[in-house]
């Protein structure tokens, strides 16, 4: 289960586990200057953003880079990449908060130098109660298709409850 956390979104809003409760969300780790897997991951997640309404789903991309603590950088990244901030939260925080969040909630690892190794292709599906329900390789279209199917089930379950 995702533990309590408090991070800051690209619009300066506080994003917590409580603010994400009552609907499923998709989470991943990234940084704005990444030229490796992040562009592919972002493109695939854009398809998820387009498939659902912001009332049904939240997307959470957690920056692991210190330089992304400048919210104007996250805001610019959001704008350039067509990220709808009411649905897709790009969040940051101090390094310790992000490290604890990644380690405690998502089972991230530390590398041999003790640095956070959370920047992977993994996308996490979290249900409305904060339980991780699936892990997907966000760079693969087939995995994103499975994520979309699983999300549809969770959204339907959530609509039946509310």
Cite the ranges covered by each PLM segment.
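Short loop/turn microsegments at loop-to-beta-strand junctions
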Residues: 2-3, 25, 120-122
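Structural microenvironment flanking redox-active thiols in thiol-disulfide oxidoreductases
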Residues: 40-101
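Sec/Tat-exported extracytoplasmic proteins
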Residues: 24, 49-53, 81, 102-109, ...
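Short active-site neighborhood of thiol/selenol oxidoreductases, capturing the structured segment around
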Residues: 15-45, 60
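Thiol-/selenol-based redox modules, centered on thioredoxin-like
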Residues: 113-162
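N-terminal "domain-start" segment that seeds a small globular fold
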Residues: 1-18, 43
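Structural micro-motif
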Residues: 88, 99, 106-124
